[in-house]
Amino acid sequence: MSTKEKLISHVSKEEAVGSRNKVTVVGVGMVGMASAISILLKDLCDELALVDVMEDKLKGEVMDLQHGSLFLKTHKIVGDKDYSVTANSRVVVVTAGARQQEGESRLNLVQRNVNIFKFIIPNIVKYSPNCILMVVSNPVDILTYVAWKLSGFPRHRVIGSGTNLDSARFRHIMGEKLHLHPSSCHGWIVGEHGDSSVPVWSGVNVAGVSLQTLNPKMGAEGDSENWKAVHKMVVDGAYEVIKLKGYTSWAIGMSVADLVESIVKNLHKVHPVSTLVKGMHGVKDEVFLSVPCVLGNSGLTDVIHMTLKADEEKQLVKSAETLWGVQKELTL
């Protein structure tokens, strides 16, 4: 008899039950691993699969996470370059792609990443035809459109991480300015994730008190408190972090886990995520931009109708036109 047989007496045959909450992260770079650890520490899945083309890095990351199994409640952590390892995932998070270089705009990255997606997306669909696809790779709005087109999935099952992080940065800086916790500072950044994002100043509030009623010039020129700088800090934030440490990882990883949580726990929380906005706010083209959306079990269930001022809507339409200008040149 083996040590195991001497130690344990078998009572019943374990029935093979598939994972109920399997999450896959594609890409084990800085963002992928920050997303993975954030998902694990929030106990959001019973199985985590990692995929990447760089086999040694992948193997090392999987082993490193497995060595911490004692401290986690996720009993299965797997990884392979073969997409069969991702089979039957509930949520697939795509972080893979060429990394944004210092000073490079997110839009510059496009065609490089489209070519990578042509390999990734069909493989995800093959093994998890019912999954919810979450795109994080930049430029996220265009790549969410690309993933939607390549997957053939209905629009509610393809979500971009969008301005969920931009809005978090906004609320953090607002909190610093007011000496309040970010969760008590309400403000939404919509539109493109990145340089032409739109801060909805009309909706900024604390405890239901609209800050624009207290300071009518908030967000505009001639505001003595220069709140406009808060949005500039949001836009420059990522570039600043990249300049200092070479990449961004922790905040986007936490943002991804926040979105995954709303889906797997069916929370019906509202998040600013990238979705198909054609027909909304004067947008005429087939583009993905961030607007407040309800996330639950089946993905994106509803869109909240924001009351935007004319100039905010104009900025949104301008963003859409910029994105469409790039999209129509892409070879899919």
UniProtKB/Swiss-Prot annotation:
Function: Interconverts simultaneously and stereospecifically pyruvate and lactate with concomitant interconversion of NADH and NAD(+).
Keyword NAD part of the UniProt annotation: yes
Residues involved in NAD(+) binding: 29-57, 99, 138
Binding positions (substrate): 106, 138, 169, 248
Complexes and interactors: Homotetramer.
Catalytic activity: (S)-lactate + NAD(+) = pyruvate + NADH + H(+)
Residues in the signal sequence: none
NCBIfam families, A to Z: L-LDH-NAD
EC number(s) stated in the UniProt entry for this protein: 1.1.1.27
GO molecular function: L-lactate dehydrogenase activity
Family: Belongs to the LDH/MDH superfamily. LDH family.
Designated name of the protein: L-lactate dehydrogenase A chain
Keyword Cytoplasm found: yes
InterPro entries attached to this UniProt entry: L-lactate/malate_DH, L-lactate_DH, L-lactate_DH_AS, Lactate/malate_DH_C, Lactate/malate_DH_N, Lactate_DH/Glyco_Ohase_4_C, NAD(P)-bd_dom_sf
UniProt main location, coarse: cytoplasm
